[in-house]
């Protein structure tokens, strides 16, 4: 077709706030297919041409959920941890070859994600999509392999490094329990 992708942005994804067994396997299949499979396939298809030209890049939208287990978002958080780890691995694998990889990890962003996720968003702070996109592009241009948008999000990503994962999981479960239907 003669098309060339200079920068691939894998931004599509969805999640659900629910008790694990309250969602269908079909929902989880769709989530994993979009959040992981589509991202891998698009990256696999676009990167060879970037390597051939000696330049290009991939921005994969992960999440602040990538950094710790998230009760009531177990499958979503696991899928975003996959995105983060894949992206950082590819950044290391292709370093110095002209193709740059960035995992963009936003927190709550004012999109339709939360309504699709069935989340109770009362009192939650949100960034605008424009703020997240600008921060992501700046991180990409500056050669970062991971960018966490927002100071509070960055600090929360450090919790699993200073506290045990069990403690972090208990804290997160307490924070999010009232955000899902019983």
Annotate each PLM feature.
Residues 11-16:
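Conserved NAD(P)H cofactor-binding loop of Rossmann-fold oxidoreductase domains
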Residues 19-20, 27-32:
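Substrate-binding pocket helix/loop in short-chain dehydrogenase/reductase
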Residues 21, 70-74:
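Active-site loop immediately N-terminal to the catalytic Tyr-X3-Lys motif
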Residues 43, 79:
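Active-site helix of classical SDR
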Residues 68, 89-100:
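Active-site-adjacent segment of SDR/Rossmann-fold oxidoreductases
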């Amino acid at each position: 077709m003669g098309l060339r992708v200079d920068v691939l942005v894998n931004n599509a994804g969805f999640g659900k706030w629910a008790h694990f067994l309250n969602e269908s396997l079909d929902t989880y299949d769709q989530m994993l297919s979009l959040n992981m499979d589509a991202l891998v396939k698009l990256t696999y298809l676009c990167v060879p041409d970037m390597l051939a030209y000696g330049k290009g890049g991939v921005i994969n939208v992960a999440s602040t959920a990538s950094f710790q287990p998230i009760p009531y978002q177990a499958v979503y958080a696991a899928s975003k941890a996959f995105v983060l780890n894949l992206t950082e691995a590819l950044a290391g694998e292709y370093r110095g070859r002209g193709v740059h990889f960035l995992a963009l990890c936003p927190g709550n962003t004012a999109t339709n994600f939360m309504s699709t996720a069935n989340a109770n968003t009362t009192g939650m702070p949100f960034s605008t999509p424009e703020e997240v996109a600008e921060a992501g592009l700046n991180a990409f241009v500056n050669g970062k392999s991971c960018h966490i948008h927002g100071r509070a999000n960055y600090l929360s990503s450090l919790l699993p490094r200073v506290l045990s994962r069990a403690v972090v999981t208990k804290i997160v479960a307490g924070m999010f329990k009232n955000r899902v239907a019983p």
